[in-house]
Amino acid sequence: RRVFEERALIDGGFEAIVSGHRKGTGSSRETAPQCERWSGIRLVIAASFAPIHERNNINLGQLMGDHSILERLQNGDSIDLSEFTSKYDPITRLILENGGILPFAKKLNNGEIILPESTTLERPMTMVEKIIAQKMIGKNRDGTFVKPGDAILAAVDGGYSHEFTTAQVHTFLKNEYGDDYSIPNPIKFAVFEDHLLYATNVPKFSPHIAKIETLRDMQKIFQRHT
């Protein structure tokens, strides 16, 4: 019997989830925190977090804290938002405090958020640093320079999505921008079937064929937006 039954989280009415050390180890895919987020979880407590899992939580706007935060909440204390965000760089704080990467990006595009100015002075840069500096969003001057450790946003030239992530991406963009959303420069964005290409004829996948077909259908819907 499963220790954690299907739909136990989404039907449980939970708002917080509590774990031990290195929460998310082995769960680097975005799906792990996405399942928690869209099951109603808004506060994630752990003794420590695996780095990729922590980053994915940040991008979803999930507040994270340790067990001392949990004890204070159990004692009825009010905790200021800054206690959850102050340890991060200025841009990460903005992402968290505005509800995640998509709400943040929408507000940034609408001019509701101003990015911190780059303060790195002129310096020799590697080829990668030069590319990043050229692509930096919100450059405050010509000849912008970057250095290791700078927190910046940079525009990308292209991207991709496969059928294990497309359904979620489509849902998130639709929720944020509406049914008629579009992505910038779609000709540079690839959409392809990868993980489930041969799943129909794999016996262990047979109990999940209906869900697999849903993922494939959502892939086609997303393609029409790209």
Residue ranges and their predicted role:
Residues 1-226:
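Fe-S-dependent hydro-lyases/dehydratases of central metabolism
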